[in-house]
Every structure is written in structure tokens, then in C-alpha cells.
């Protein structure tokens, strides 16, 4: 059969709330069986999490990210598992050859998220201002395509898209309409951690370059690219757990110590980034071991 096929049968939806953390699998058709979807309206804010190439929603870093969100604030976390279309289940030696197929599936998965969003807004009265998307690697571009589609559907913009080391291959030379772009949400936050698998391009309202966006500390010399690429997910979970864990310094002032940061010019990575006035590119020094925080207890 075709490799890495996308259709609504090859995607699963995992929903987590404080009351219901059991990570059961749902589809668009069975969503209404979930306790949260039996309500007339859903009042809590929603975060979608989308994984990347050859990964899945049950990979431990994504489980930890979802848990951090549910623990931190009363979010409903919707994890999109598109592992089949991301080539996760193809023969190990061959799956990398199918990357272009997975890359082209990102638009379809994004449209699928937009369909779920339409249901949330129309049937459950959720405001778009209460929905944000977090996507890693190819999942960052999935989130961008979802952001384009909801605007086509006249739903407005998502409040935020967080792109965790958006994938470089197949996307780097693309026009805005063919990749994650800063117009895809009210606020687009990009975390750069690698420069081969991930892009170095400025894509967002704010772009954070962790350790200059490559060779992240603690990743070693070998396989450091894959390790650095994955670090983006780990850093985001820590930034949700610890307020102002990672502070970004404007790249124009990257020699300045974090201790001199003010909330006018520096920005805390994470869910509160958009509350800071500063925009553009930021340098983020990172410690080599968890929780990786650079703020030495300082909160701006």
C-alpha cells in the first residue's frame, strides 16, 4: 500500500484534563464520548500538541509536556497522534526516504486540527482567544497549516502557535503560505535548538535561539543534532513548570548578562512570552542539565 498514508482513520486524538488523565484514544467521530465533550460548553483553555517526523504522541517528552500543561493551569490538552502519516511505523531502514511524504502530509493534519477547532468553537462555544497550538519539527508546520485553515474558515486566529524547532528540510525555502509563518496566529513563538533538522530562519513574532540555536549543552558530539532538535520540547516543558526559567536577551545585546534584563527588553520563554512587549530575535543561554533554567531565580 501507499507509504505513510494520511486519512482520518490514521489519526488519534488524546484528551487530557485534571479530572481525566487516562490518555484514551479518540477520533473525530468518537469525541463526543469523552466526558469533557458531553458538556454543553467547554470553559477551560485548550492547547493542541503535535509531534513530528517518526514520532508519536506517546513519546515521553510529549507526555511530559502535556502533563506540565495540565498541572500548571487547568488546560484541556489535545494531543494529535499522526504517527502513521509521519512514517513512524514504516520499516526502520526506509522511513527516512519517505520524509517528503510526511512533509506533504503536514497540510492535511493541519486541516484536521482546524476541523476539530471548528467543532470546539461552533458546538462548545470556545473562543479562539482560548486556543493555542504547540508543535515540534514537522508538527510546527502542521500547526501553521491549521492556523491558515481556521482563517479560511472565518473562525479568526488562534491566540498563539509555539513552534518547537520547526523542521528545516522541505520547508526552508518555502513561501509563507507553505510553512509555519508569523501570520498563522495572533502571536507566533519559535524555539530554535538545531540548525540542520531544525530551521535557523526567523519565522515568528519572537524567535528564541537556545544556545545560539545549535549544539545544545549536554547533547555531546555524536547524535547531537537529534538531541538538540528534541531539546526544544524538553525546554518548553521546563518553561511551563518554572516561571521565567529561560530568559531571552535581544540578539543585538547578546553579550549582556541576564541579570541586567528588564521586562521592557527581555522576554521569558513559554506561555507568558506574549505578555512582554519586546519582539524579534532573542539569544537564550541554556544550562546543560535539567531544568536548564538560566535565570538564577530572577523573574522579570
Swiss-Prot record:
One of its GO terms (molecular function) is phospholipase A1 activity. It is an enzyme of class 3 (hydrolase). Gene3D superfamilies: alpha/beta hydrolase. It is found in: Secreted. Expressed by the venom gland. PROSITE patterns: LIPASE_SER. Keywords: Allergen, Disulfide bond, Hydrolase, Lipid degradation, Lipid metabolism, Secreted. Disulfide bonds join 4-87, 176-181, 219-227, 244-268, 245-293, 261-266. It catalyses: a 1,2-diacyl-sn-glycero-3-phosphocholine + H2O = a 2-acyl-sn-glycero-3-phosphocholine + a fatty acid + H(+). Its EC number is 3.1.1.32. Catalyzes the hydrolysis of phosphatidylcholine with phospholipase A1 activity. May act as an allergen and induce hemolytic activity. Belongs to the AB hydrolase superfamily. Lipase family. This is Phospholipase A1. The lineage of its organism: Eukaryota, Metazoa, Ecdysozoa, Arthropoda, Hexapoda.
Amino acid at each position: 500500500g501507499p507509504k505513510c498514508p494520511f486519512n482520518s482513520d490514521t489519526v488519534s486524538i488524546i484528551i487530557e484534563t485534571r479530572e481525566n488523565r487516562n490518555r484514551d484514544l479518540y477520533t473525530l467521530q468518537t469525541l463526543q464520548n469523552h466526558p469533557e465533550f458531553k458538556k454543553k460548553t467547554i470553559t477551560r483553555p485548550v492547547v493542541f500538541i503535535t509531534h513530528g517526523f517518526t514520532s508519536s504522541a506517546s513519546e515521553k517528552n510529549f507526555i511530559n509536556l502535556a502533563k506540565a500543561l495540565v498541572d500548571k493551569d487547568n488546560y484541556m490538552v489535545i494531543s494529535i497522534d499522526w504517527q502513521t502519516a509521519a512514517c513512524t511505523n514504516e520499516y526502520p531502514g526506509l522511513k527516512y526516504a519517505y520524509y517528503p511524504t510526511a512533509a506533504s502530509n503536514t497540510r492535511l493534519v493541519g486541516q484536521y486540527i482546524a476541523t476539530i477547532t471548528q467543532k470546539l468553537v461552533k458546538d462548545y462555544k470556545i473562543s479562539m482567544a482560548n486556543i493555542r497550538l504547540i508543535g515540534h519539527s514537522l508538527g510546527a508546520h502542521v500547526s501553521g497549516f491549521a492556523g491558515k485553515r481556521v482563517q479560511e474558515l472565518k473562525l479568526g486566529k488562534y491566540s498563539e502557535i509555539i513552534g518547537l524547532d520547526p523542521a528545516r528540510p522541505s520547508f526552508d525555502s518555502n513561501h509563507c503560505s507553505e510553512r509555519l509563518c508569523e501570520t498563522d496566529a495572533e502571536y507566533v513563538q519559535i524555539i530554535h535548538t538545531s540548525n540542520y533538522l531544525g530551521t535557523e530562519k526567523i519565522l515568528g513574532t519572537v524567535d528564541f535561539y537556545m544556545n545560539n540555536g545549535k549544539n545544545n549543552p549536554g547533547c555531546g558530539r555524536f547524535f547531537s543534532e537529534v538531541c538538540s532538535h528534541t531539546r526544544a520540547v524538553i525546554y518548553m516543558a521546563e518553561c511551563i513548570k518554572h516561571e521565567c526559567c529561560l530568559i531571552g536577551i535581544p540578539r543585538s545585546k547578546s553579550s549582556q548578562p541576564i541579570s541586567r534584563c528588564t521586562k521592557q527588553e527581555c522576554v521569558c520563554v513559554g506561555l507568558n512570552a506574549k505578555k512582554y512587549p519586546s519582539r524579534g530575535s532573542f539569544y537564550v543561554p541554556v544550562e546543560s542539565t535539567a531544568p536548564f533554567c538560566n535565570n538564577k531565580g530572577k523573574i522579570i
